[in-house]
Design a protein with these regions (language model features):
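Short hydrophobic/aromatic beta-strand or adjacent loop that forms the aromatic wall/cage
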Residues: 7-11, 83-87, 113
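Short, charged/polar surface micro-motifs in flexible loops or helix N-caps
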Residues: 18-21, 29-31, 40-41, 73-74, ...
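N-terminal strand-loop-strand
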Residues: 1-34, 46
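Short, charged, intrinsically disordered terminal tails
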Residues: 127, 142-151
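The catalytic Nudix box helix
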Residues: 34-68
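NUDIX/MutT-family hydrolases
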Residues: 100-140
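A generic structural signal for short beta-strands and their flanking turns/coil linkers
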Residues: 30, 63, 68-69, 82-86
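Active-site-adjacent beta-strand/loop module that shapes the phosphate/pyrophosphate-binding cleft
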Residues: 73-104, 117, 138
């Protein structure tokens, strides 16, 4: 029997007032991606969410953050790896339709340029790595909630 490695991830469905979903394309990533990343030692999924969104998008303020679900996704190629994925939803007030963000932190992604844009949730089928699995859990209208910033 082969040992399986478990990796904990925080995944962010970030939307804006129009209901559009933030996605990006970048080097080393196949297909459309959402902000996501591996939890660091001692970090909670929520803390990782704020860090990853800031690192990969440059956005520093997230509104109405809510946990949607947690699953286990298995990469079947050798060596097998299981990802414990924590999916969150957050809204932002972002007027730009498209922008390029260069990662300043983020370890292996440092210096990578991500091309960010907004898409309708109906385009989620184009997402890589089954990242579209829980788009159906997004509210039909963005919630008006408390504001939480990356520094929280």
């Amino acid at each position: 029997m082969t040992d399986v490695t478990y990796v904990r991830k925080a995944c962010a469905y970030v939307t804006r007032a129009t209901g559009e979903l933030l996605v990006f394309e970048g080097p080393g990533h196949d297909g459309l991606q959402i902000p996501k990343g591996t939890l660091e030692a001692g970090e909670s999924p929520r803390e990782a969410l704020f860090r990853e969104v800031a690192e990969e998008t440059g956005l520093g303020t997230l509104n109405g953050v809510s946990h949607l679900t947690t699953d286990v996704w298995t990469r079947r190629r050798s060596p097998p790896k299981r990802y414990v994925r924590h999916f969150f939803h957050a809204t932002v007030h972002e007027p730009r339709d498209r922008w390029v963000h260069t990662v300043r932190d983020g370890g292996d992604e440092h210096g990578s340029a991500f091309a960010l844009r907004w898409v309708r949730p109906s385009r989620a089928g184009e997402f890589a790595l089954d990242l579209d699995d829980y788009v159906h859990l997004l509210p039909s209208t963005p919630p008006a909630s408390d504001v939480a910033s990356v520094s929280d």
